[in-house]
């Protein structure tokens, strides 16, 4: 593994942990040369899954897009990076376990919302506002009222 700080090719593993899903290994590494420390993640790689967009276009499933959306929704909340990573891993695992070669963006959005609702109400409302393309304040209020009823 190449060091991201100095580019040296020799690093050593300080710590390895498997996440609760058993699908990801987190490794803490240290560069032998500059002593810089960094974290790497190892995940299973399944066959390609394609996402069918609202306009009918298809593109390769991209975990990073889900991660970016969830991170934006969780900004300035008490949700940790580990919780975000786990949520995204769970969504990816659900998509891969389905065995489908294609999935609609709407289905991915539903999976994310289902998991965000359990994790953090504010992040859920933020994500819902983009996913459902809110145009009026009443749409926000409806989602907030729905959350209140469930608690």
UniProtKB/Swiss-Prot annotation:
Obligatory cofactor(s): Zn(2+)
UniProtKB keywords: ATP-binding, DNA-binding, Metal-binding, Nucleotide-binding, Repressor, Transcription, Transcription regulation, Zinc, Zinc-finger
Key word Hydrolase present: no
Record's cofactor remark: Binds 1 zinc ion.
Coiled-coil parts of chain: none
Domain ATP-cone, first and last residues per copy: 49-139
Zn finger spans (unnamed): 3-34
GO biological process: negative regulation of DNA-templated transcription
PANTHER family named in the record: TRANSCRIPTIONAL REPRESSOR NRDR
Function (record text): Negatively regulates transcription of bacterial ribonucleotide reductase nrd genes and operons by binding to NrdR-boxes.
Protein name: Transcriptional repressor NrdR
Classification lineage: Bacteria, Thermotogati, Thermotogota, Thermotogae, Thermotogales
Gene: nrdR
């Amino acid at each position: 593994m190449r060091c991201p700080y100095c580019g040296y090719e020799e690093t050593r593993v300080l710590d390895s942990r498997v996440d609760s899903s058993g699908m990801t290994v987190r490794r803490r590494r240290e560069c032998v040369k500059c002593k810089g420390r960094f974290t790497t993640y190892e995940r299973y790689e399944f066959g390609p899954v394609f996402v069918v967009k609202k306009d009918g276009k298809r593109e390769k499933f991209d975990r990073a897009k889900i991660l970016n959306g969830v991170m934006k929704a969780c900004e300035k909340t008490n949700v940790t990076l580990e919780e975000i990573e786990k949520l995204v891993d769970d969504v990816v695992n659900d998509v891969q376990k389905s065995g489908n070669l294609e999935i609609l963006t709407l289905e991915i959005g539903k999976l994310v919302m289902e998991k965000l609702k359990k994790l953090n109400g504010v992040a859920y409302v933020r994500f819902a506002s983009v996913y459902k393309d809110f145009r009026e304040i009443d749409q926000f209020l409806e989602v907030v009222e729905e959350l209140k009823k469930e608690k």
